[in-house]
Amino acid sequence: MTDLVAVWDVALSDGVHKIEFEHGTTSGKRVVYVDGKEEIRKEWMFKLVGKETFYVGAAKTKATINIDAISGFAYEYTLEINGKSLKKYMEDRSKTTNTWVLHMDGENFRIVLEKDAMDVWCNGKKLETAGEFVDDGTETHFSIGNHDCYIKAVSSGKRKEGIIHTLIVDNREIPEIAS
């Protein structure tokens, strides 16, 4: 019998991670799973409220599950990533990253650009890149298999919009996924 009470999907640069939390309110059990792997197991926790902190993904991003009593024997479970609510973290992240998903050579590829460092990730691995200045901006070149790729960064000309990043694979523009 499982005491699964909460499941979250967290999109990081190295992929989307599934976090599951079991809370046995009668047994005092707390179990945290990340991508199906047990990270924390505590038995006989007589204090039913509190928090569990662990790390997610290749960058060891700090995550905390908060357990709060809301009434009687009802509990609320919230996830924080790097000290922010999951919602706030994802809103902030959407401003600092671009994500593209494409299918080629019979495989799916998830490409993430971290705009602050210009790091490029593909399916959980940080790629070797080469930056180049061009007439209207910059290009960050990399390869996926036998495919030549680059992310073009150009000014939008509007202060609010800032820089526009476009992924080009084999001279074809790839649409960004909505975050």
From Swiss-Prot:
Belongs to the FAIM1 family. The keyword Transport does not apply. This is Fas apoptotic inhibitory molecule 1. The keyword Cytoplasm applies. It comes from Homo sapiens (Human). Plays a role as an inducible effector molecule that mediates Fas resistance produced by surface Ig engagement in B cells. GO terms for cellular component: cytoplasm. Pfam families: FAIM1. InterPro entries: FAIM1, FAIM1_dom_sf. One of its GO terms (biological process) is apoptotic process. The modification N-acetylthreonine is found at T2. Keywords: Acetylation, Apoptosis, Cytoplasm. Disulfide bonds: none annotated.
